Amino acid sequence: MKKTIILTLLQVVFFCMNAFSQDRQQPYLYLTNYTIPKQSNTIGQIRITTTDIKSVAVGGEHANAFKVSKDHELSVRPDKLKINTATFDVVLNVKTSAGELSKTFRIVKDEFIRNKVIAHRGAWKNTGVPENSVAALKYAVTLGCEGSEFDVHMSADSLPVVNHDPAIQGVSIAKTNASELLTIKLANGELLPTLENYLKAGMEQTKTKLILEIKPSELGKESSIALTRKVVALVEKLYAQAWVDYISFDYDACKEVMRLAPYAKVAYLRGDKTPAELATDHFFGLDYNFNVLEKNPDWIEQAKSKKLTINVWTVNDRLQLEELLKKNVDFITTNEPELLLSIVK
């Protein structure tokens, strides 16, 4: 009996330790926004988890361009907006009840395009380059799309790579190490892109958002959540917060992004949640196939009333595109970005 009790207690302790290890154990410093709005000098709130902020000092290369209010709101000095740079690096030195914390943030002038056009897997169909290639991303940027969507899987040794399907050229991504995957060439001669290289290419400009889809893992939920954590960590490592919005068919992965990155804009893809459910769970928006919205036509107005953004995929027909524009959806994901651009212009 004693042995059974001891084993049970050990199992409980192990479970609690494991669950705790998945949470942020240290104070996490973040901003509620990473862009400088066109019509305002206010960027966003400085926030921290697990403790409170006593004071904030600004440092770094562009320290003199920013100021912090008494309620910890970060803003840019109006005269500094004329500086001929699209990005500013700022270090926030924060004193808390638990000690001091210093972190670098990249703030981006909000010059991102607003035309509703999201290039599905980049602009590939009419350009002759492979979908989800860096070349397809660059074509989407050149066209002037508001966003370029792409898909992320994780190798057997935990490297995120960009590809739509769980396998590439017959090779399972989740069951293959990165050293082998990264020898695979796309049709245009590019190597299979790592997420890091893809993000770096996207961050060379400040016009087109990067719409990052976290793909559910063929190995199950645990692997999907592991990928989610890798993705968010890499976005923060590269200071890519201003560029990246998140989408996924995996509801738990979406919620994990929001837990790890409370500032993140996250939309859900599967179409099995009502706007009210998404709003309750603090989603940024819904991102549903057009068939879902045809079956639930009132969801568009419901989403608007809940202040959720609305993206519809994957729409390639002119009449459907025009009808959705009349309904004033926020974004349309399409394999025909050139066609949609010709309509919105």
Can you describe what each PLM-predicted range is?
Residues 21-59, 63, 70-345:
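Phosphate-group recognition and catalysis centered on beta-loop-alpha active-site segments
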